[in-house]
């Protein structure tokens, strides 16, 4: 392994990697911290896996946690301005005080970035920042509201240097451009309105900025809770259909292409629903290129159809209550 231009030997003994560094004490210190941290984390995982059979392992786990806590903090206090200190702050786990024992996850979510030196641009040369962001946004923010996520983003951006801010913004752009949870489209809109439309960001050209703003403007009209855009199309039987004329407790907008295998499967399901449910009306809209004479490109743009099938669920007032189901 080549680390900071120094020679590193990767040796294996009994299945455990032992790393030796030649020519640099500082680099050696990094690997020592990494090795001790990884070893103790693996030990805790092993102890946790046996808790069902050995409940007393909980005391060993607490002991290892305390050891790592003291070990990491001693490095930070001894070398506060070093990159080793930054490295330790990024690999150490956020710990909730004992008084927050019953609400530790809430504490961690609210203090996750407090101790991170997000003005140290050297961190961009590693995966440490990405790893930290992955854990926070993929785990802790997974079930949070868009409003809460936006609050955390604003705090994170405010705390970061310009270089780290640029990296974080593109990371968030990638994550929320087409989010798994449709409600998080509000997060993308927030990113555009507050950052991508206003700031000078690395690699953000005028053309890219315009396209990003355009997509946010489309999304803000079709987020959950908004009224569906007006829809006119010609169905497979040559009949003109208007969404405004449809009266039902629930309305499914099913955008599909005939050569899409998942569309074929889903269309059978929705055809069955249409026949068996009196309170559900299904509008199946063929958006294939061959059908553009019956379905305008405006529909594809208005409803932000990037993949097929795309599905919207409306209530009796034509309000969007779910998307991408």
Where would I find each of the regions flagged by the language model?
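Start-of-domain marker
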Residues: 1-10, 140-145, 156-165, 176, ...
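N-terminal "domain-start" segment that seeds a small globular fold
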Residues: 204-243, 293
